[in-house]
């Protein structure tokens, strides 16, 4: 499956963001995490 890049909308309960990204519960999009 394709992963979701930065600023892509996402579901925090089913996080499909790319590696190094995390789905923000507040904003509902993929944010970069260090």
From Swiss-Prot:
Q: Which SUPFAM superfamilies match?
A: omega toxin-like
One example GO MF annotation: sodium channel regulator activity
Disulfide bond entries: 3-18, 10-23, 17-30
Q: Where in the cell is it found?
A: Secreted
Keywords assigned = Disulfide bond, Ion channel impairing toxin, Knottin, Neurotoxin, Secreted, Toxin, Voltage-gated sodium channel impairing toxin
In terms of PROSITE patterns, this protein maps to: HWTX_1
What Gene Ontology cellular-component terms does the record carry?
extracellular region
Which InterPro entries does its entry note? Huwentoxin-1, Huwentoxin_CS1
* Expression tissues: Expressed by the venom gland.
Described function? Voltage-gated sodium channel Nav1.7/SCN9A inhibitor.
Per the record, the similarity remark reads: Belongs to the neurotoxin 10 (Hwtx-1) family. 14 (Hntx-1) subfamily.
**What does its UniProt record remark on the domains?**
The presence of a 'disulfide through disulfide knot' structurally defines this protein as a knottin.
Q: What is this protein called?
A: Mu-theraphotoxin-CCy1a
Task: Tell me the organism.
Answer: Chromatopelma cyaneopubescens (Greenbottle blue tarantula)
């Amino acid at each position: 499956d394709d992963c979701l890049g930065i600023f892509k909308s996402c579901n925090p309960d089913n996080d499909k963001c790319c590696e190094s990204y995390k789905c923000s519960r507040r904003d509902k999009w993929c944010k970069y995490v260090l």
